[in-house]
């Protein structure tokens, strides 16, 4: 069976609230770490989310 091209990643909030999103990314085309601005409901504003490993 072939290895899947998409992997699950965890996007951790940079606001330090402990909130995170789980999403997928294509490991072959996006080799660098993902950084996205998304809404943090704990901080109640848009902050940067940085890629981390799912434990």
UniProtKB/Swiss-Prot annotation:
| Gene Ontology molecular functions | structural constituent of ribosome
What keywords does the record list, in alphabetical order? Answer: Ribonucleoprotein, Ribosomal protein
GO biological process terms on file:
translation
Instruction: Kindly state one GO CC term assigned in the UniProt record.
Output: cytosolic large ribosomal subunit
Instruction: Name the SUPFAM superfamilies on file.
Output: Zn-binding ribosomal proteins (SSF57829)
InterPro entries found in the cross-reference section? Ribosomal_bL33 (IPR001705), Ribosomal_bL33_CS (IPR018264), Ribosomal_bL33_sf (IPR038584), Ribosomal_zn-bd (IPR011332)
Coiled-coil annotation reads: none
PANTHER family (alphabetical): 54S RIBOSOMAL PROTEIN L39, MITOCHONDRIAL, LARGE RIBOSOMAL SUBUNIT PROTEIN BL33M
**Family to which this protein belongs:** Belongs to the bacterial ribosomal protein bL33 family.
Q: What is this protein called?
A: Large ribosomal subunit protein bL33
The encoding gene is: rpmG
């Amino acid at each position: 069976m072939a290895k899947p091209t998409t992997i699950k990643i965890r996007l951790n909030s940079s606001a330090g609230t402990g909130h995170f999103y789980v999403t997928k990314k294509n490991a072959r085309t996006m080799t660098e770490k993902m950084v996205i601005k998304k809404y943090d409901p704990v901080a109640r504003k848009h902050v940067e989310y940085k890629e981390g490993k799912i434990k």
